[in-house]
């Protein structure tokens, strides 16, 4: 029997994208730092609110005692960020594949939206008015400024942590850089 995991699905999609010649951009250091800030840090294995083993910056363990983690536990901060960078692959793939070739984003804009995708999930990203607006050719600064702050609820309730996260993502989105991210070559 094949065991399905979100990470396996993300890797399968990434593999298919790469096989087609698509180069998925990686989130930059500012992206990793932003996600790390809001995911929180735990160097030792702990149980998340639904009882799943978790470690580092919210890495959901796939095997007992996080046996798949290639770093010694307790994690160092450096190894925790390396693990987070690997975990971000699904959100990076999602953001790259959800946007059309007409969408031009610099590395900070892309990173802000990768953080959002990491938090809300790819299904929500793909069906969002934010992505529809970007793909329609709406001004990126306008559509993101209007739509991103609306993603501040959990269970129908405005959560202060999500309000802060969206504000930080928007600040990163508006931070200029000469480094490009999208459109990605071959995607």
Residue ranges of predicted features:
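Substrate-binding/active-site groove segments that recognize
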Residues: 47-70
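Alpha-helical segment that forms one wall of the substrate-binding/catalytic cleft
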Residues: 69-101, 107, 111-125, 140
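Long, amphipathic alpha-helical surface segments
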Residues: 18-44, 78-81, 85-86, 123-187
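Extracytoplasmic
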Residues: 30, 50-52, 108-110
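Secretory/exported precursors with cleavable N-terminal leaders
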Residues: 37-40, 57-60, 120
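Fungal secretory targeting signals
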Residues: 1-21
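Structural recognition of the beta-strand scaffold that forms the well-ordered cores
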Residues: 34, 54-56, 112-117, 143-147
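Catalytic glycan-binding domains that act on GlcNAc-containing polysaccharides
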Residues: 42-49, 104, 121
């Amino acid at each position: 029997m094949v065991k399905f995991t979100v990470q396996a699905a993300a890797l399968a999609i990434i593999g298919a994208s790469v096989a087609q010649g698509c180069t998925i951009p990686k989130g930059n250091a500012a992206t990793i730092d932003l996600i790390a800030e809001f995911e929180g840090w735990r160097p030792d294995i702990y149980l998340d609110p639904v009882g799943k083993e978790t470690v580092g910056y919210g890495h959901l363990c796939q095997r007992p005692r996080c046996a798949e983690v290639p770093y010694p536990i307790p994690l160092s901060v450096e190894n925790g960020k390396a693990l987070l960078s690997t975990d971000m692959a699904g959100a990076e793939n999602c953001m790259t594949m959800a946007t059309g070739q007409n969408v031009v984003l610099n590395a900070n804009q892309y990173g802000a939206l990768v953080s959002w995708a990491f938090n809300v999930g790819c299904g929500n990203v793909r069906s969002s008015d934010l992505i529809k607006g970007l793909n329609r050719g709406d001004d990126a600064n306008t559509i993101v400024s209007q739509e991103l702050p609306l993603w501040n609820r959990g269970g129908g309730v405005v959560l202060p942590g999500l309000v802060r996260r969206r504000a930080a993502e928007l600040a990163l989105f508006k931070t200029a850089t000469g480094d490009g991210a999208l459109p990605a070559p071959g995607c």
